């Protein structure tokens, strides 16, 4: 096995393990990892299957209510955010939301991995805990 295949397999396993750590081990994940030459950013094409019907309007309102998430919902060519465009931003950008049927949705998600990662997440979690429990 060559080095690149080994790295990609480890990244795929890490993606699955971290998602299951957050959402529980029962969540099924079909992951594909690809290394592409970008200066900054992580990008994910996410396909979600739900047990309940998806109300796209409610989902859009909910996403827009979260600080740190930015929805780019343009139904035109180029109406999505690229990793390069996320550079220098703290937000996680969601675009290309599309419903396959009432129970499946696809998303394109990008973020600047140098800004939005474990360090910033830790600060934001700490701020939220202080706001909730110490004020």
Please place each PLM-identified region on the residue numbering:
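Generic structural "secondary-structure junction" signal
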Residues: 5, 36-41, 71-73, 94-99, ...
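Glycine-rich active-site loop/lid that clamps phosphate-bearing ligands
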Residues: 74-83
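Flexible, glycine/charged-enriched surface loops at secondary-structure junctions
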Residues: 29-30, 72-75
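Active-site-lining helix/loop region of Rossmann-like oxidoreductase modules
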Residues: 1-62
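A common structural junction motif
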Residues: 58, 63-72
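C-terminal helical cap and adjacent loop that interface with cofactors, partners, or active-site loops
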Residues: 49-51, 64, 82-135
């Amino acid at each position: 096995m060559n080095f690149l295949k080994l790295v990609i397999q480890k990244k795929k396993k890490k993606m699955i393990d971290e998602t299951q750590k957050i959402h529980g081990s029962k969540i099924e994940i079909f992951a594909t990892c690809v290394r592409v030459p970008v200066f900054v950013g992580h990008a994910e094409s996410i396909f979600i299957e739900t047990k309940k019907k998806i109300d796209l309007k409610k989902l859009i309102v909910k996403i827009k209510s979260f600080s740190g998430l930015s929805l780019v919902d343009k139904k035109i060519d180029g109406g999505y955010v690229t990793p390069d465009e996320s550079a220098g931003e703290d937000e996680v950008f969601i675009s290309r939301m599309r419903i396959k049927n009432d129970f499946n949705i696809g998303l394109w998600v990008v973020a600047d991995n140098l800004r939005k990662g474990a360090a910033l997440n830790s600060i934001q979690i700490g701020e939220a805990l202080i706001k909730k429990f110490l004020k």
